[in-house]
UniProtKB/Swiss-Prot annotation:
Cofactor note: Binds 2 Zn(2+) ions per subunit.
Compartments, as annotated in UniProt: Cytoplasm
Binding partners and assembly: Homodimer.
Binding site for Zn(2+) 1: 48, 50, 70, 178
Residues that coordinate or bind NAD(+): 50, 203-208, 227, 232, 273, 296-298, 373
Binding site for an alcohol: 50, 70
GO biological process annotation, one example: formaldehyde catabolic process
Region forming the signal peptide: none
Family designation: Belongs to the zinc-containing alcohol dehydrogenase family.
Residues noted as binding Zn(2+) 2 in the record, renumbered to the chain: 100, 103, 106, 114
Cofactor(s) annotated in UniProt: Zn(2+)
Protein's name according to its UniProt entry: Alcohol dehydrogenase 1
EC number: 1.1.1.1
Length: 380
């Protein structure tokens, strides 16, 4: 047991007091973990677009003050009662979704959508007692998706913590906690392209680049990037993209452009934007008879799309995915090993690295479109 186990820890956290306002480094009190919980010492964290979306709070109920952050790597400081798969000193990745191991989803080999620990962006408390483990001078501070990694210490449900190889560099593998696995798994676990096949990737942000990386790892020979920003093609080449289409450059639907490029359509398509039109295009650009399209991007609340039923009857398949179909505790350690073996290249996703005291720079980089992933070093 650590010498801080069972005690309240005072540490630094970047607190969002208001929507869209710069985070403030504050001293917070972090309560000990309760039954089924883990307290982690965060060493590295990174900024994901989801953090920015809920920090801006333009499309949902604001919940402040709040500690954001959900991509991170750290070390287990202490564990609550009943936690057996983790112990102090273990290297771990907290994840915004979880694996209770008991529900029908966890017992199914096909699903990772745990009934108990599935992501809940509106919940700012722990599920054990509906209370926060963070406070400032007695005032509770809300959690974010059960992780809140913009803090030197955080408390997470044990089912949302993946124990990993202690030799893995936390400043690299921390980015596997969300976006990279979401795109990577959408390709390798759901689309499953065969060696020598063709894959279209819609949207070349971090998730789309990760989907392209999955296509590269799978041995796809043609990886077609589709994006409205042509300058992204040069960067995407590092992730295996070898052809590029900007829909704005054509006077016909992009699915028709791709069909003409590929003699009837690509074998697989992965949509990573959340745009309804991109979803339609991704589905309609796959080849009849065997084509598979996978939707990753999150649409707006009231969005809906339509496509002709013949597109299905002609043996095209449309699938959706959540976190790349990875079970956090079971599968994430294996993804880390793929990196350790050199099969998965993470360094090329990391464009910036800053000290914790400069965390607001990470928001600036993302809002300007200058970063893929910015690593935030907790120890300065």
């Amino acid at each position: 047991m650590s010498n801080t186990a069972g005690q309240v820890i005072k540490c630094r956290a970047a607190v969002a007091w208001e929507a869209g306002k710069p985070l403030v480094i504050e001293e917070v009190e972090v309560a000990p973990p309760q039954a089924g919980e883990v307290r982690l010492k965060i060493l590295f964290t990174s900024l994901c677009h989801t953090d920015v979306y809920f920090w801006e709070a333009k499309g949902q109920t604001p919940l402040f003050p709040r500690i954001f952050g959900h991509e991170a790597g750290g070390i287990v400081e202490s564990v609550g009662e009943g936690v057996t798969h983790l112990k102090p000193g273990d290297h771990a990745l907290p994840v915004f979704t979880g694996e209770c191991g008991e529900c029908p989803h966890c017992k199914s080999e096909e699903s990772n959508m745990c009934n108990l620990l599935r992501i809940n962006t509106d919940r700012g408390v722990m599920i054990n007692d509906n209370k926060s483990r963070f406070s400032i001078k007695g005032q509770p501070v809300h959690h974010f998706v059960g992780t809140s990694t913009f803090s030197e210490y955080t408390v997470v449900h044990a089912g949302c913590v993946a124990k990993i190889n202690p030799d893995a560099p936390l400043d690299k593998v921390c980015i596997l906690s969300c976006g990279i696995c979401t795109g990577l798994g959408a390709t390798v676990n759901v689309a499953k392209p065969k060696p020598g096949s063709s894959v279209a990737i819609f949207g070349l942000g971090a998730v789309g680049l990760a989907a392209a990386e999955g296509a590269r790892m799978s041995g796809a020979s043609r990886i077609i990037g589709v994006d409205l920003v042509s300058s992204r093609f040069e960067l995407a080449k590092k992730f295996g993209v070898n052809e590029f289409v900007n829909p704005k450059d054509h006077d016909k639907p992009v699915q028709q452009v791709i069909a003409e490029m590929t003699d009837g359509g690509v074998d697989r398509a992965v949509e990573c934007t959340g745009s309804i039109q991109a979803m339609i295009s991704a589905f309609e650009c796959v080849h009849d008879g065997w084509g598979v399209a996978v939707l990753v991007g999150v649409p707006k609340k009231d969005d809906a799309f339509k496509t002709h039923p013949m597109n299905f009857l002609n043996e095209r398949t449309l699938k959706g995915t959540f976190y790349g179909n990875y079970k956090p505790r079971t599968d994430l350690p294996n993804v880390v090993e793929q990196y350790m073996k050199g099969e998965l290249e993470l360094e090329k996703f990391i464009t910036h690295s800053i000290p914790f005291s400069e965390i607001n720079k990470a928001f600036d980089y993302m809002l300007k479109g200058e970063s893929i992933r910015c690593i935030i070093r907790m120890e300065e």
